[in-house]
Regions:
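Histidine-rich, glycine-flanked metal-binding segment
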Residues: 4-74
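Functional cores that coordinate and move charged inorganic groups
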Residues: 185-193, 199-224
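Divalent metal-coordination and catalytic microenvironments
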Residues: 30, 50, 68, 79, ...
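Short loop/turn motifs at secondary-structure junctions and domain boundaries
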Residues: 34-38, 85, 150-152
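Histidine-centered divalent metal-coordination motifs
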Residues: 76-83, 171, 200-202, 223
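Divalent-metal coordination cores built from histidine and acidic residues
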Residues: 2-16, 93-200
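Di-metal (Zn2+ and/or Mg2+/Mn2+) metal-binding site signature of metallo-dependent hydrolases
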Residues: 69-92
């Protein structure tokens, strides 16, 4: 978008926010859930170019009368395994979008344990264009342990092939916490590869100095 177009949009948004110009869309008479102040606010919500520009009393080119219905931010599921549901991404979206979930962060380590990179590619391809935003964390532990028999083994060099995909956010739950704290070479290669990305953790019983070692390995979150 050109700089002049951005400036023009800003001028329009400011005028609409001040009530000097009609919004393109207004949700009228809603019970607005304010998740910051834990309040329910009765009023209108003005929208311009897909962006909320004001809450209060507004008029719009198009108005939708909510008549006291609740208006709230949608939910984001920060960690989910789509394949655990035994349905496709499209069917999964049909089940959760009507219930207010519009974004999920998927860790496809179950399908990857069976189909490897092809399983991850399937999730990425089949979730394209859905009314649900699907982001992916690449599975860090395929297989989960060396004692398992799996359909694939994913090393750092395999994950590298997908890490720059647009909807890939980082490295999925690092269940192999012994590998982290004991400096396993394969595990350290993955942690190094994703050092500038989000790395999810999964260390339910780790504590004290081992926990310190786990965290300095680059783990950003905890599954439990």
């Amino acid at each position: 978008m050109r700089l002049m177009e951005v400036e023009g949009m800003l001028k329009d948004m400011i005028k609409i926010a001040k009530g000097e110009k009609k919004a393109s869309l207004v949700f009228k008479n809603a019970n607005i859930v304010n998740v910051f102040t834990n309040e329910i606010i009765v009023g209108d919500v003005a929208v311009y170019e897909g962006r909320i520009v004001g809450i209060g009393k507004y008029s719009g080119e198009k108005e939708i009368a909510l008549e006291g219905k609740y208006l709230a931010p949608s939910f984001i599921d920060g960690h989910v395994h789509i394949e655990s549901s035994m349905v496709t991404p499209a069917q999964f979206a049909k089940a959760i979008v009507p219930r207010g979930v519009t974004t999920i962060i998927a860790d496809p380590h179950e399908i990857a344990n069976v189909k490897g990179l092809d399983g991850i590619k399937y999730i990425l391809e089949e979730s394209e264009g859905l009314p649900l935003d699907v982001y992916v964390m690449l599975p860090s532990c395929v297989p989960a342990t060396s004692f398992e028999n799996s359909g694939a083994v994913l090393e750092a060099e395999d994950l590298k092939k997908l890490m720059e995909e647009e909807r890939v956010l980082g490295l999925g739950e690092m269940m192999n916490y012994p590998g982290v704290v004991n400096g396993d070479e394969g595990v350290l290669e993955k942690l190094t590869l994703f050092k500038d990305h989000i790395i999810d953790g999964h260390g339910p019983v780790i504590k004290d100095k081992e926990l310190n070692a786990y965290v300095v390995g680059g783990i950003d979150t905890e599954h439990e």
